[in-house]
Amino acid sequence: MSTVPIESLLHHSYLRHNSKVNRGNRSFIPISLNLRSHFTSNKLLHSIGKSVGVSSMNKSPVAIRATSSDTAVVETAQSDDVIFKEIFPVQRIEKAEGKIYVRLKEVKEKNWELSVGCSIPGKWILHWGVSYVGDTGSEWDQPPEDMRPPGSIAIKDYAIETPLKKLSEGDSFFEVAINLNLESSVAALNFVLKDEETGAWYQHKGRDFKVPLVDDVPDNGNLIGAKKGFGALGQLSNIPLKQDKSSAETDSIEERKGLQEFYEEMPISKRVADDNSVSVTARKCPETSKNIVSIETDLPGDVTVHWGVCKNGTKKWEIPSEPYPEETSLFKNKALRTRLQRKDDGNGSFGLFSLDGKLEGLCFVLKLNENTWLNYRGEDFYVPFLTSSSSPVETEAAQVSKPKRKTDKEVSASGFTKEIITEIRNLAIDISSHKNQKTNVKEVQENILQEIEKLAAEAYSIFRSTTPAFSEEGVLEAEADKPDIKISSGTGSGFEILCQGFNWESNKSGRWYLELQEKADELASLGFTVLWLPPPTESVSPEGYMPKDLYNLNSRYGTIDELKDTVKKFHKVGIKVLGDAVLNHRCAHFKNQNGVWNLFGGRLNWDDRAVVADDPHFQGRGNKSSGDNFHAAPNIDHSQDFVRKDIKEWLCWMMEEVGYDGWRLDFVRGFWGGYVKDYMDASKPYFAVGEYWDSLSYTYGEMDYNQDAHRQRIVDWINATSGAAGAFDVTTKGILHTALQKCEYWRLSDPKGKPPGVVGWWPSRAVTFIENHDTGSTQGHWRFPEGKEMQGYAYILTHPGTPAVFFDHIFSDYHSEIAALLSLRNRQKLHCRSEVNIDKSERDVYAAIIDEKVAMKIGPGHYEPPNGSQNWSVAVEGRDYKVWETS
């Protein structure tokens, strides 16, 4: 699917130029940093920025002569040896606010025009269609030819895309006008607005904008103009579907006398990217043996360097001893903050750092305001220094990672890890034996699972500390697409943060893969480690969840080549990619002799033996289903050897051909989890998660407090996979719904004082979420309570489990708050097995302390973390939620 080329529409309409800020003449205050490290801290502050674009900057060689005072005297030194020089691209994201307007007016007698406009500059596309009289459902149709403005193109057979054009030079409004054909049987006009620059779709109250042209168009809360009389065109029954021309003309004149003009506005905000750069030069001063670092940037406004120094072969931040330069402050005894000096012309700022020659490097991030931190591709800026005069610092592209030899300590730890694994196996056998005895051993099994969790965490901790280290900066670009180390199959490292990279409407553009590529750097800088892509195969439904030919990877999201390029792009920025594998059902190519669709084509040309026998809709000759049936398509019989063989080959082919790192498994309730284990063993994913979604427990319409039966069903499925895949924590989502909506926060603690979802029983296999393409987006099957989304994210992004963030929420007004929570989770190294101590669970407030270094509360009630040996400071806060971290 292609989109409208609109290069002529103000191609650089929103390219910002940094305005020069004149603060008057200011004398330069040199920065002197005479550093002697004495305190070690963990690496701080993952950024909210993203990195693209490069710009050049002028630099002057400088040296700092040490004095007995607290400041230094700056003098030029042309003889300094350059040991490091780099220009880092950075990107700031700002929010522009404006409006979308819809106007209906009579331009001439009996000629009506509908205009849609936007006040924010950009490459705007109107994606629209119509509903005809007598239509049922929500599907669009294409409008009559004479209603299509110039420059419109057809999208398949259901929509039109028309570019908005700038009204006039110097005008900030973009608009498209549609001449209404009132002689046709069009009942309503439907549209969404798309920003070609960002790929964002703008809807009305979570649905399409709908402009009714008749009175009784169903109102789903998204009608425009109906309250002002628009739509008074007569009842549907009064407009014949087929008429001769003269009859239609007569009737349209009679029926459209009630048409009235209207004008409506809706607020809109757009995230705008501004490209800047940071230039860093490090020199060795031969006279003082100091390392002189120059940092220069064209970022506007006040820029603060949040920094630390490195030594002893690590990148851990260490705080120096005094003296500090002017405008430097201590941050939580973990880092220093130094405000850069403004340039004389006000366009950017710079600073000079004189560092001890024995140090190994300088780490820093940039702070622009309370919620804006900039780093480089999700990592701290790092300036390495020479360790000897004969070993120059290699650039990132030139370095090649070299594995270290195993030490005796590592070999010993490896043996100890094997002992732990043996113990875990024994515990698993213990669980199995209890099940075979058919005794009531639920509590025993739970205790065993908890013991396994502890042992697994211990083994993983040993693994992380003893795995041979590779240079973090020295990976060849050709090798970056396929990481050499896989920590485990199906369960990841424990520190994953998942981004769902699509919504229910993403297929409509036909170029979703290309749009995602443009967001790779930003998603990496936010701290995401895993991206979930939509189903890639040919599908009867455009969203991809009714697969047909599994080996045809040209879909409504893009071509197979675009898919492969997208995966490579995300690998390049350090993000793993999950494919959405629909294994439960498959749409047939041909009918059988009875006219039933159950014969398949393509490379996997199965017959009706591949279809389960107990679904009467599709007359399968396989065995009975091992799960629940999905009645919209033939359910596949996974008990058949040839089916499992073909699926395993297909998954392995997808891994090899596309480069997927793992799977999101659709509708796993439809077949036994043991088959999933078989598929995971064959494809060896880095991370895998299944969608096991069924109803929670209710009594007389009220949600039960105890949801153990619900989470037990999910845990049983995970057990059936032998833990080879995790599962979405539907239990936690459901309990959050009721707790937040009814102000019943006591629900968030189970009778044993633990989280009440899967995350409370098996956190390393629980993928927590608050929304996805089914529950939210334009489907809205189970939408999270409106206005309380950030409370949900404050919960899942601070708690154990693997959190998943929905695409629509990332690129919304919640962006900065979600980014701050992501930064906190990464900064404090929270993980899927983090320990939760629930401190409060009452009617109007829930509070917990995680790993003794993060405290959080949600709900309107009051809470402050307990005073003690820890010093708490507020890290993130918003409407009815607050998060603290230790200092």
Curated annotation (Swiss-Prot):
pH and activity: Optimum pH is 7.5 with p-nitrophenyl maltoheptaoside or amylopectin as substrate.
Lineage, highest ranks first: Eukaryota, Viridiplantae, Streptophyta, Embryophyta, Tracheophyta
MF terms (GO), sorted A to Z: alpha-amylase activity; calcium ion binding
Protein name: Alpha-amylase 3, chloroplastic
List of residues binding substrate: 545-546, 664-669, 693, 695, 712, 754, 760-762, 773, 779, 857, 884
Family classification: Belongs to the glycosyl hydrolase 13 family.
Summary of the function given for this chain in its UniProt record: Possesses endoamylolytic activity in vitro, but seems not required for breakdown of transitory starch in leaves. May be involved in the determination of the final structure of glucans by shortening long linear phospho-oligosaccharides in the chloroplast stroma. Can act on both soluble and insoluble glucan substrates to release small linear and branched malto-oligosaccharides. Works synergistically with beta-amylase toward efficient starch degradation. Has activity against p-nitrophenyl maltoheptaoside (BPNP-G7), amylopectin and beta-limit dextrin. Involved in stress-induced starch degradation.
Coiled coil region boundaries: none
Known tissue expression: Expressed in developing siliques.
One GO term describing the cellular component: chloroplast
Catalytic residues (UniProt): 666, 691
GO terms classed as biological process: starch catabolic process
Keyword ATP-binding attributed: no
Disulfide bond residue pairs: 499-587
Reactions listed under catalytic activity: Endohydrolysis of (1->4)-alpha-D-glucosidic linkages in polysaccharides containing three or more (1->4)-alpha-linked D-glucose units
Mutagenesis / variant outcome for changing residue 666 to N: Loss of catalytic activity
Cofactor(s) in the UniProt record: Ca(2+)
Disruption phenotype: No visible phenotype under normal growth conditions.
Description of how activity is regulated: Redox-regulated, with the highest activity under reducing conditions. The midpoint redox potential is -329 mV. The disulfide bridge between Cys-499 and Cys-587 inhibits catalysis. Inhibited by CuCl(2) and H(2)O(2).
Notes on the domains: The N-terminal domain is not required for endoamylolytic activity.
InterPro entries: A-amylase_bs_C, Glyco_hydro_13_cat_dom, Glyco_hydro_b, Glycoside_hydrolase_SF, GWD-like_N_Ig
Phenotype upon changing residue 363 to S: Increased activity under reducing conditions, but no activity under oxidizing conditions
Subcellular location: Plastid, Chloroplast
This protein's UniProt keywords: Carbohydrate metabolism, Chloroplast, Disulfide bond, Glycosidase, Hydrolase, Metal-binding, Plastid, Transit peptide
EC number per UniProt: 3.2.1.1
Induction / repression: Circadian-regulation. Expression increases during the light phase and decreases during the dark phase. Up-regulated during osmotic stress and by abscisic acid.
